[in-house]
Amino acid sequence: MNFVIFDLEWNNAYNYKAQTGMNEIIEIGAVMLDERLQIVDTFKQLILPKVSKRLTGRFKDLTHITPDEVKQNGIPFEEAFRDFARWSGADNCVFMSWSDSDLYVLAGNYKYFSQRAHVPFMQRYADAQKYCMRFLTDNPNNNQISLAHCAEKFQISVEEENLHRALEDCYVAAACFKKVYDPALFEPYICDCSGDDFERLLYKP
């Protein structure tokens, strides 16, 4: 079994068709770990925005991604995630991200671009943040913590200026996960996403 830790960087856009705000994915990064938790492959891709062509100042300040960089190296969402699904070899892996907010954004983008929230290649998912937090003894209220804070607690060296780029965040998340991985303890955190989990994630009564 492989593990794929992915991270998304998104831009705040306004979906005029739905008359609501939307977090539009601009970059995806991922690392693949084998059963010995060795990084065996990486994935990184910029995505051409369709909902809003303008990158917000906050997005540019946080990621240091420029409009020219996106224009020169970006590809459409559908193509990017076809490539990602092919790269992941999804049948035998558990997907992870740092908190399920990435999962929520991914489902929202799938719903916008394909009219259905289900992410077909993602069968199993685990929240790496939630799993790692169980090992923090000084967090009695179980408050969510940032990736950088968790790395600090686990005594993992992090270059702050490299954070908030998708692939770099994946390297840090992988290092945190490797510090505390135990197959028996991790197993209950794996969710089956083969049904209507994504639709339920986005359901608003």
Please place each PLM-identified region on the residue numbering:
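Alpha-helix initiation/capping motif
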Residues: 19, 70-73, 140, 163
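Extreme N-terminal starter segment of soluble prokaryotic enzymes
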Residues: 1-4
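Metal-dependent phosphoesterase signature
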Residues: 61-84
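Short acidic, Gly/Ser-rich segments with clustered Asp/Glu that frequently serve as metal-coordination loops
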Residues: 8-18
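Metal-dependent phosphoesterase core characteristic of DEDDh/y 3'-5' exonuclease domains
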Residues: 23-28, 32-63, 86-205
